[in-house]
Amino acid sequence: FRPALIVRTKGTRL
């Protein structure tokens, strides 16, 4: 799992 992927998913969910 990459940290960048989680950050991008959180931004898209917002």
Curated annotation (Swiss-Prot):
Q: Which UniProt keywords apply?
A: Amidation, Amphibian defense peptide, Antibiotic, Antimicrobial, Secreted
Location(s), subcellular: Secreted
GO CC aspect terms: extracellular region
Name the tissues where it is expressed: Expressed by the skin glands.
Q: What's a BP term from Gene Ontology annotated to this protein?
A: defense response to bacterium
Q: Does the keyword Secreted apply?
A: yes
Entry-annotated residues carrying Leucine amide: 14
- Write out the similarity annotation: Belongs to the frog skin active peptide (FSAP) family. Hyposin subfamily.
What the protein does?
Has antimicrobial activity.
Protein name stated in the entry: Hyposin-H5
To which species is this protein native?
Pithecopus azureus (Orange-legged monkey tree frog)
